[in-house]
Amino acid sequence: MKIYIIAVGKIKENYISDGIVFYLKKLRPYCEIEIKEVEEEKAPQNLSEKEKEEILRKEGERILSKIKKGSFVVSLAIEGKEIDSYKFSQFIKATFQSGYREMTFVIGGSLGLWENIKKQSHLNLSFSKMTFPHQLMRLILLEQLYLAFDGKNHL
């Protein structure tokens, strides 16, 4: 089983990078994970709605170019479905048991995620109604994946 994480922008803080490396090592016995970064558009101050939509579109097109056909796509979005860690592990298990060999998790940039990606995803998933920095979401996702595979949540 293979998991892709497609994320907008590069990690800038060492503590986040260190955490990502930590969880990638812990996940290695359970699955293959590849993180694909796409370029983040620079957003000017006092962005108009039209400018925001254009930035989301450009980032979104880059994301779409990285999604492999046949992969089960999960977009992380604040308005998505909320589930707990146990249900997340059951969801991962059920997805792979249903015949999918790959899952792709998509994390948008600082402005969020292009609406077209959310519409094309199999699932829009929310980890919380709170807003988290998009770079930190990679670490949070990896931690939840580790919990799912580690057996504490019965995967």
Curated annotation (Swiss-Prot):
Question: Catalyzes what?
Answer: pseudouridine(1915) in 23S rRNA + S-adenosyl-L-methionine = N(3)-methylpseudouridine(1915) in 23S rRNA + S-adenosyl-L-homocysteine + H(+)
UniProt-annotated location(s): Cytoplasm
User: Short name of one Pfam family for this protein?
Assistant: SPOUT_MTase
What InterPro entries does UniProt report for this protein, alphabetically? Alpha/beta_knot_MTases, RlmH-like, tRNA_m1G_MTases_N
Q: Name one GO cellular component term.
A: cytoplasm
What GO molecular functions are on record for this protein? rRNA (pseudouridine-N3-)-methyltransferase activity
Keywords attached to this Swiss-Prot or TrEMBL record, sorted alphabetically, are: Cytoplasm, Methyltransferase, rRNA processing, S-adenosyl-L-methionine, Transferase
User: What NCBIfam families does the annotation carry?
Assistant: PRK00103.1-3
Q: What protein family does this chain belong to? A: Belongs to the RNA methyltransferase RlmH family.
**Physiological role:** Specifically methylates the pseudouridine at position 1915 (m3Psi1915) in 23S rRNA.
What's the subunit arrangement here?
Homodimer.
Q: What is this protein called?
A: Ribosomal RNA large subunit methyltransferase H 1
Q: Which organism is it from?
A: Thermoanaerobacter pseudethanolicus (strain ATCC 33223 / 39E) (Clostridium thermohydrosulfuricum)
Q: What is the lineage of its organism?
A: Bacteria, Bacillati, Bacillota, Clostridia, Thermoanaerobacterales
